[in-house]
């Protein structure tokens, strides 16, 4: 995907060696150097920009992180301020993030937990290198907790121990050394959610390479599908979903915010009125997803109301429409599901799915979807 390539590219430019085999990568690090020209382009990848803002504090010399205009409009200030509290020379200027690295003092830092869990993960990744270790205090409750739990699990695999409070509001990391390890990358529940939802809408779909015990927050799509009445069967490393008459649900998406477009389009054909809360952070994604979902569903004849932290969808019979994806991969894929149900739907900016799921349109066609790209 574009995001994976963005991360691979910037890591290579600071000295990380990545050898690709057919189904694995061998990564050799611990020899960071200043990138030629000092610039690292993170494309549209928020995770790459946020993680590298922290990692570049360990790189000797100056690094200048740049990204697409839409990504640079998204929040980064809380992470910069948290790093400054740890002694990092970092600033946000001239449409870039500039870090003068080479050493990390460490100490105690504070930041909000309700903007992006990636800020917390970024600090956890570098804290073992800090001379004084690192203590992270969150001034607001942590949202998207599962992704921080995944970070802690990953760190543990590489020999890093982190002490934390039960509510994940405080983290303590002593100075430690990463140990080489083998790490298995799970199948992505976020990408799989579209195919699983399609099964509930159109027939029967089985998705393989999914860990039913995963920590990934978007695994919650299974619970939502079951609550809506879909037939869901867990197999050996696979999930099967069968079409069913769907009913409305009320759901808190605080810890699985990326599922909003998916569950909203399911609600559009469900019997009754669904209410989704805990969605305020969805306004800070590649698009304002709350408003974008309302706009798209309204174009398809579905009654939708929005508040800052709530979306209410009344199910009906959607009609085909022209949908503006806003350049947002999750919007494009979610509305493709309704398009598959009702036909006559055009997704503008459909190429944006390459950000995380470049094979999406080919897979949709492969399972019987009537898809035509760019008039072809």
Positions of predicted regions on the chain:
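Short, structured segments at the rim of ligand-binding sites
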Residues: 1-376
């Amino acid at each position: 995907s574009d995001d994976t390539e963005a991360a691979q590219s910037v890591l290579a430019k600071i000295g990380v060696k990545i050898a690709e085999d057919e189904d694995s990568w061998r990564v050799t690090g611990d020899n960071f150097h200043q990138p030629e020209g000092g610039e690292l382009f993170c494309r549209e990848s928020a995770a790459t920009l946020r993680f590298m803002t922290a990692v570049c504090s360990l790189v000797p010399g100056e690094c200048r992180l740049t990204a697409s205009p839409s990504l640079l409009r998204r929040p980064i200030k809380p992470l910069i301020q948290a790093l400054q509290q740890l002694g990092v020379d970092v600033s946000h200027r001239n449409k870039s993030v500039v870090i003068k690295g080479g050493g990390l003092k460490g100490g105690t830092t504070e930041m909000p937990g309700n903007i992006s869990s990636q800020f917390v993960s970024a600090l956890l990744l570098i804290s073992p290198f800090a001379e004084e270790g690192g203590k992270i205090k969150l001034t607001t409750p942590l949202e998207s907790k599962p992704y921080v739990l995944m970070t802690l699990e990953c760190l543990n695999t590489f020999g890093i121990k982190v002490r934390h409070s039960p509510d994940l509001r405080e983290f303590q990391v002593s100075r430690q050394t990463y140990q080489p390890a083998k790490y298995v990358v799970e199948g992505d529940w976020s990408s799989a959610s579209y195919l699983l939802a399609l099964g509930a809408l159109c027939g029967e779909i089985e998705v393989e390479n999914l860990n039913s015990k995963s920590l990934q927050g978007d695994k919650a799509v299974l619970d939502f599908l079951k609550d809506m009445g879909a037939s869901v069967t867990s197999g050996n490393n696979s999930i099967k979903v069968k079409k069913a008459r769907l009913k409305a649900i009320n759901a808190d998406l605080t810890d699985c915010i990326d599922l909003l477009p998916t569950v909203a389009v399911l609600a559009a054909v469900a019997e009754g009125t669904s209410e989704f809360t805990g969605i305020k952070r969805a306004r800070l994604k590649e698009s304002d997803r709350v408003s974008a979902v309302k706009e798209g569903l309204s174009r398809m004849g579905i009654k939708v109301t929005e508040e800052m932290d709530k979306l209410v969808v009344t199910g009906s019979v959607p009609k085909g429409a022209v949908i503006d994806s806003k350049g947002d991969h999750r919007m494009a894929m979610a509305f493709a599901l309704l398009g598959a149900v009702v036909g006559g739907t055009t997704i503008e900016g459909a190429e944006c799915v390459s950000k995380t799921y470049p094979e999406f349109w080919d897979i949709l066609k492969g399972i019987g979807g009537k898809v035509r790209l760019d008039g072809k």
